[in-house]
């Protein structure tokens, strides 16, 4: 019972704080994508992020795919100059599986943990590192002249993001 009470306390501490209601505009580089994003901290401990951009596949590394999505972030440790948080990720990926001839799309859920450092003194710049796991598998049909075969696309499971943001108070 103590663990549940502690978890509830951690989830809701600081939800009414005005001091850290911030919005950040920035960019994110990951293993297979580059995305502009908007991160909104509604309190010291709760945030949301919306992103979208170009992506690639593990097999070809060509930036010919697209992805859009969101993150729900919950800080587990907060200091004046950094945050440690966990998050839930949901994204939709549009994939060119055989060049431009065959396309498919799939939802990809994930979880992550991140650390963000920021400076209030110099235009509120922020830098974050995120590490996590995502899962997405899609089976699709491929038409080859007279034959139709089934292929499977699997999303790369590792989330490794580096992000840079410019924050301002809301």
List where the protein language model places each region:
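Positively charged n-region of N-terminal signal peptides that target proteins for export
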Residues: 1-4, 20
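Sec-dependent N-terminal signal peptides
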Residues: 3-14
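Short glycine/proline- and aromatic-enriched beta-strand/turn motifs that initiate or cap beta-hairpins
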Residues: 17-63, 165-170
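Sequence/structural signature of outer-membrane beta-barrel proteins
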Residues: 22, 32-34, 53-59, 77-79, ...
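Transmembrane beta-barrel architecture of outer-membrane proteins
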Residues: 22, 31-33, 65-69, 106-112, ...
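Gram-negative (and chloroplast) outer-membrane scaffold detector with strong preference
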Residues: 39-127
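Outer-membrane beta-barrel "beta-signal"
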Residues: 153-170
């Amino acid at each position: 019972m103590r663990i549940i009470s502690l978890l509830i306390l951690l989830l809701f501490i600081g939800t009414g704080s005005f001091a850290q209601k911030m919005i950040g505009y920035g960019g994110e580089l990951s293993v297979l994508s580059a995305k502009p994003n908007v991160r909104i901290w509604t309190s010291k401990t709760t945030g949301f992020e919306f992103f979208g951009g170009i992506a690639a596949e593990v097999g070809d590394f060509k930036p010919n795919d697209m992805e859009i999505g969101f993150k729900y972030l919950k800080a587990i440790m907060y200091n004046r100059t950094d945050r440690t948080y966990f998050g839930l990720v949901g994204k939709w990926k549009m994939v060119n599986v055989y060049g431009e001839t065959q396309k498919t799309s799939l939802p990809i859920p994930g979880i992550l943990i991140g650390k963000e450092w920021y400076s209030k003194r110099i235009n509120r710049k922020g830098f974050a590192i995120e590490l996590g796991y995502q899962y997405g598998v899609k089976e699709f049909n491929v038409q080859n002249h007279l034959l139709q075969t089934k292929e499977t696309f699997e999303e790369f499971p590792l989330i490794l993001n580096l992000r840079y943001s410019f924050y301002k108070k809301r």
